[in-house]
């Protein structure tokens, strides 16, 4: 009996980083029931995430024993290099969102502590998503990520737009989840398995099955919604605009990284990428995402909506990587999503630092709110400038390296049309990213509606924003270190 118990405990070692976050959730719940304290709750959340991150890094370095999964868990989850790489990114992004939330909620008089609880619960779902290798764990972890987001998006419910964004995401996300379930049912009916690898083994006998193609298409529709890929992108700008700034940051970083990692593993492990119909569907989604995302962003006057449309275009670039090089897309897609997530944290972080949850008129999301920011806050302007240049793919930023790899992936797959689409999309994107930069350096308005404190760089959120800016510049100047780092993200 003791041996059995010890084996069970050893089988939980690979999950130690996730268990650390689960324990943090319990501690936060107890802390809230004992005495409400924003500082205590925020500190516990950050400490718990740091512990999980350090355990994960220790396991990757071989310092901490990572054990082996119990047989029952092996059917649902896998802890490989790909999962560990994306878990590191999720931990870093969740830490950034927690610290930005602390600064954002400082002036909120209502309950602040529950936001950390929801964010930690959602992070557990995200961590499980990148490890899922079974359709049951696929759906379970996805819902663990999504359900807390409904409350997080509506957290500043005193603002109509925030409440609207939460309700809109709830309704549309539920529809996407139902579509995913239906697709899973069709695939199971055809191949008789919910595990990714057995689906791949039976694919040769059911290659042209209409039921399999329909199931794969329905699953791709659900995945496209979660990724904000066209034509399932309509919700993105509205939800980004209405969401509290730190939650928009979370949606653009943690949620996107987890969903893309799950999608890549699903497509590679099941070999569904071998289906010509799936390849064509991905190509259409990628093309529409790049064109619609960039063209619609050109007309935006809201920075948050602009970043929302920008995210649609960037998901298109990653889809091109997946459809072009197939099973080799794991490391490049992970690298692209990591840099995109860090850039989103920097851009939305500036919005968060300048916003207040109690302004019924909204947050600092209009471009006019940033007019002349350079003359008041030059360092903050430098942060936003670097983020915009990285999103545009300008040299000496990490965004340039990832976009270059996306083009090279399309060329390697001889998808010349898709390579041209990346170049065209980048050219269009350059216009609206530079428009943001011109606004920052214009002559300031006489009346300043939104501003940040002079000591913003010493606050927790400000430190995190500066840190991700340094990462973007470092990997842009020394890309070899980023490439070596991303090469670890391989699916076994």
Swiss-Prot record:
It comes from Psychrobacter arcticus (strain DSM 17307 / VKM B-2377 / 273-4). GO terms for cellular component: plasma membrane. Belongs to the complex I subunit 2 family. Its EC number is 7.1.1.-. It is found in: Cell inner membrane. GO terms for biological process: ATP synthesis coupled electron transport. The keyword rRNA-binding does not apply. Keywords: Cell inner membrane, Cell membrane, Membrane, NAD, Quinone, Translocase, Transmembrane, Transmembrane helix, Transport, Ubiquinone. This is NADH-quinone oxidoreductase subunit N. The keyword Transmembrane applies. It is a multi-pass membrane protein. NDH-1 shuttles electrons from NADH, via FMN and iron-sulfur (Fe-S) centers, to quinones in the respiratory chain. The immediate electron acceptor for the enzyme in this species is believed to be ubiquinone. Couples the redox reaction to proton translocation (for every two electrons transferred, four hydrogen ions are translocated across the cytoplasmic membrane), and thus conserves the redox energy in a proton gradient. It catalyses: a quinone + NADH + 5 H(+)(in) = a quinol + NAD(+) + 4 H(+)(out). The gene is nuoN. NDH-1 is composed of 14 different subunits. Subunits NuoA, H, J, K, L, M, N constitute the membrane sector of the complex. It comes from the Bacteria. The chain crosses the membrane at residues 12-32, 44-64, 76-96, 115-135, 138-158, 169-189, 212-232, 244-264, 272-292, 306-326, 334-354, 381-401, 416-438, 463-483. The lineage of its organism: Bacteria, Pseudomonadati, Pseudomonadota, Gammaproteobacteria, Moraxellales. GO terms for molecular function: NADH dehydrogenase (ubiquinone) activity; NADH:ubiquinone reductase (non-electrogenic) activity; quinone binding.
